[in-house]
Amino acid sequence: NVQQVPFYRIAHDAIRSGNWGWSHLTDLGANFVGSYSFYLLGSPFFWLTIPFPSESLQYLMGPLFILKFASATLTGYVYLHRYTKSRNTALIGSVLYAFSGFSIYNIFFNHFHEAIIFFPLMLAALDEYMENRRRGLFALTVFACCFVNYYFFVGQVTFTLIYFFLRLLCRSWRISLRDFLLLALEAVLGVGMACVLLIPSVLTVTQNYRTSNYINGWNAVLYNKNQRYLHILECFFFPPDLPARPNFTPESESKWASLGAWLPLFGMTGVIGWLQLRRKHWLKKMLWVLFLMALVPFLNSSFQLMNSSYYARWYYMLTLMMALATVMALENERVNWKRSITWTLTITAAIAAVIGFMPTLTKEDGKLTDVTFGLEKYPTRFWTYVAVSMICIGAVAYLFCFCKDSRRHFQRATLVCLSLVSVFYSIFFIAIGKTQSEYTYDHIIPYALNGGKNIDLPDLQSCRSDFYESLDNSAMFWEIPSIQAFHSIVPGSVMEFYDSIGVPRDVASRPKAAHYALRALTSVHWLFDDDHDDDYFAGESLDDPAMPGWAYYGNANGFDIWKNKNYIPMGFTYDYYLSRSDFNALSEGDENSMGSREPAMLRAVVLEDDTIRRLSGLLQELPEDRRNFTEESFEQDCADRRLNACTSFAYTNTGFTAEINTDRERLVFFSVPYEAGWSARVNGEPVDIERVTVGFMAVVAPRGEKVQIE
């Protein structure tokens, strides 16, 4: 609800309207291609929505998921069928892959499923090249994987290199130098064809400070949370935890990490059975290598360019190998299924017993005051998961005891059981997730999904709005500019700006009400407060606003609406400047309190030293005696900026246009994130864009009336 649906709508409408350059609806503004290539632009499923009207997009999410799961089953089959004797066995493996714990866990992130779909094709093309020297297919699949999602492509490259060289070392494959160079050429050509999306994506992502946080020290050798090891182990034996509500290991700090690898019905029985065979098969070694990589932090992070953030978003590739091991075990008469079922049952029961019955002692002043049993956070859900795993183990045992006599009967019975388990555990997972979120019929369906059509405010498209403790990205879905945004990929200048005033900005922009000067600087005119929750912007009686200068305007569309009396229109001028060094000397503030830097931005534009020299004579340096800031002076600064603000402002497909009246040559500031690709014209003449106020842009406008800026 908070990312995928709004992103689909923004990108869909941008493509249909030709607004492919700059998205003013994403945070404070963002490069459209760079910000949405990770989520949507490379996905063929997104492009299928383009012919449909914008109002239908939320209703297409379900059909698109059906198509994605079907496609993952198909591509899984394309890879697996080479290794099986029977098409039905390959079909079993493809269903295991498509409905693995990783796929179900990541229903929340529906853009992850494109990687799940296309990756088997790249391995299948590599297999075809190595077996039959069929050329061209590998280049096409490399292009597809890179084009669809560059982030997952990094992990796919790591995996494919391990897969390729391990099979060479195991003598499963042989290749001449000439054929190797031709294969490498295909890989290069595939990446080259994907550069149309890859280059703008890289240019955007490299601005994000999160990409430069490399794993190091002891954190590269051992996980700093010991519960994470158990979380990794249990994800192979149990259905996946909810992304936001880890249950088995509540303190593993693995929320949203995509820790899911359970194979429906079979779990680890087929994998353990295959690993117990005394044969030197490449797949056996591959699985051991992958399990080791999952347990060693720096090896795990090699699937994401050694980034220090913990994610297991490469496990779909591991589940493909696990599905392959399972189907190969099904066709190998030497596999001791009784032994593998016993091992799986023992490990599953051990994990359940430790987490479900381990006592916790509570002491006060050295005296025992309480004893609780169980380490899980949600006992009912935990024991349901245990029951699902145990029932599946029992079902596998039943299939081998009573259905093994006829291969055809066994395969049909297995497919029926596998399909039932896949459907019901998926429904259970989704249903549990819905119980952890708001009741959609109270607010989301009647008010959020209507696009704000019942709200009639005159300038929603030319100013910014704020949403107080409301559903993330509501403004995106309504398609109005806002300072609130749950979006990971935004210009580096946005992150630099928020960092300079102490507001955290990692995956979302959510400045708290303590930062009221920020609202004026970024031209926030309206605030929407959900009237269906207990988080009141001004208390239940609506008489104590959380920020100064806000007045109640009315109620519409399930929201109390507040108006900012300190609103400054987009595009305004200054009389003073503050050097970056002097700005840095002011107090920064933090997440819950505003420092002096924020109100200082309303009194003086912040300039770098080279910009000060270039704009010499245009502005005066802010005097020392004017560097004290109060709530009263804040209101006066807003009034001063409002006196010399643009008389009109409108967004266009290429950026924005504005009009201003100036009494002299002035620097006009816009709270639009600076990017190197911007160009500007004033009265039709090209002008330089200045990078000011820690990441925003400004242009010099001459004296005159109705000065045009675009």
Predicted features and spans:
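Membrane-embedded helix bundles of polyisoprenyl
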Residues: 66-82, 87-169, 182-202, 207, ...
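Periplasmic/ER-lumenal interhelical loops and adjacent helix-loop junctions
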Residues: 2-11, 44, 179-180, 187-277, ...
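Membrane-interface helix-loop-helix junctions at transmembrane boundaries of multi-pass membrane enzymes
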Residues: 172-181, 270-294, 406
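Membrane-interface coil-to-helix junctions
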Residues: 1-73, 95-116, 205-210, 218-262, ...
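Transmembrane alpha-helical segments
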Residues: 72-79, 118-130, 158-166, 267-272, ...
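Contiguous transmembrane helix-bundle modules in multi-pass membrane proteins
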Residues: 133, 152, 282-449, 703-710
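Active-site-proximal, structured, solvent-exposed surfaces of multi-pass membrane proteins
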Residues: 619-710
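Extracytoplasmic/lumenal acceptor-recognition loop(s) of multi-pass membrane glycoenzymes
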Residues: 35-38, 418-444, 453-524, 563-637, ...
